[in-house]
Design a protein with these regions (language model features):
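Active-site hotspot residues in diverse enzymes, especially metal/ion-binding acidic/histidine motifs
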Residues: 1-374
């Protein structure tokens, strides 16, 4: 009896037109352009109808057009030839987000592009980062969200004190943290790529570190809490989880007591300094835990708004937030000669000289002997 049916033909490699079609579509969306917008940016060299045909894989471009497209879309030419990979699963954007469709698509395309480069870098180094879910039960109530934060801290052995570097903490535990330039209305989103949990954060959050920390943990909530898709309080549950991760209940009681009639702003400023949580989130936490009466919370919130603190809060948090894993892997791949400097620049999606400067790498002319001289 023949067993020939057990041998599978290798999957056909996608042809250039198909790869180019996907990559052009991705690069256009990442640039925040419609087909007509790209046609205009190309000064009418190519019509939007022709661009549509390229994106459908019906036509292949010549080298002149490739170079022009790369320039207009601010991406290296070889990005159009990069092998296709699985797409990010359903990306969880904030419900009721006021993000325009074009800006949302741009954020998705940039995230997809970045995570593909990240995974390619890991594969070059033969690394498979282990991620295991820190909790394994559905979250249905605010009490569940508090418990979940407690359990995540316990499973990840984080103790009860302030979390020093949230982004590094997530990366050390197998969560890919991706930073993208995005619309000011976009803070973050989360998704899965195969078994890889991915958190995407806007680079404008660097101007507000407590908000960056809170957003990262809010997105972790979407990944680990197992909230039903149609749960009406999904966003609030993730908020509660993030606040409990930053400032655990026991620490709140220890710092400010279990019952208060009022709280002074300097008290919250010192909490912000220690725990890296914003005044707004700390105040909300006191309401959540029923430490402050609802009426007092509302009065303090009015004060907060009147002072203009929703635009610029008093108090600062000096802790550092940096997800350095991608750059560390890039330097490791360079040191082990797994990649050339130009490949590193393509993976980092930045010009070669900019990468050389950012990572403080020696220039092409420098040699060990030159470096050794005083």
């Amino acid at each position: 009896m023949s067993h020939s049916h057990t041998y599978l033909e290798p999957a056909p490699r996608p042809d250039f037109k198909e790869v180019f079609a996907t990559r052009l579509h991705q690069a256009r969306e990442a640039a925040g352009l419609t087909l007509r917008g790209l046609a205009e940016a190309l000064d009418g060299q190519v019509s939007h109808t022709a661009l549509n045909k390229y994106e459908k894989g019906l036509m292949a471009p010549d080298s002149r057009l490739l170079i022009t497209l790369a320039k207009v879309l601010s991406c290296p030419v070889d990005q159009f030839f990069r092998p296709l990979r699985p797409s990010l699963g359903a990306i969880r954007f904030r419900k009721k987000s006021s993000l325009r469709e074009l800006a949302r698509k741009a954020a998705e395309a940039r995230a997809q592009d970045h995570v593909e480069r990240y995974i390619e870098l890991e594969e070059l180094l033969a690394l498979a980062p282990a991620y295991s879910a820190p909790i394994n039960r559905p979250c249905q109530s605010f009490a569940d969200a508090e418990d979940a934060a407690r359990q995540v801290r316990q499973t990840w052995q984080l103790g009860h004190g302030p979390l020093p570097n949230v982004l590094e903490l997530l990366e050390e535990r197998g969560v890919k943290v991706i930073r993208i330039d995005a619309d000011e209305k976009f803070d973050g989103c989360s998704a899965w790529l195969d078994q890889h949990p991915v958190i995407v954060l806007a680079s404008h959050l660097d101007r507000n570190i407590p908000k960056l920390r809170f957003t990262a943990l809010h997105e972790l909530g979407h990944l680990v809490l197992g909230i039903a898709e149609d749960h009406p309080d999904e966003e609030k549950l993730c908020h509660r989880f993030a606040a409990a991760m930053l400032w655990p209940q026991e620490q709140v009681y220890q710092s400010l007591g279990r019952q208060r009639q009022n709280v002074m702003w300097p008290e919250l400023v010192s909490i912000k300094r220690e725990y890296g949580i914003s005044l707004a989130a700390a105040l909300y936490r006191l309401k959540d835990l029923a430490i402050l009466p609802e009426s007092k919370y509302r009065w303090l919130q009015i004060q907060y708004k009147q002072q203009g603190w929703h635009r610029n809060e008093p108090g600062s948090y000096a802790g550092e937030e940096a997800g350095l894993r991608f750059d560390q892997l890039l330097m490791r791949a360079l040191a082990e000669e797994k990649i050339t400097l130009s490949k590193a620049a393509a993976l980092a999606h930045e010009p070669l000289e900019a990468l050389r400067h950012r990572l403080a790498l020696p220039g092409p002319a420098s040699t060990a002997t030159e470096d050794a001289q005083p």
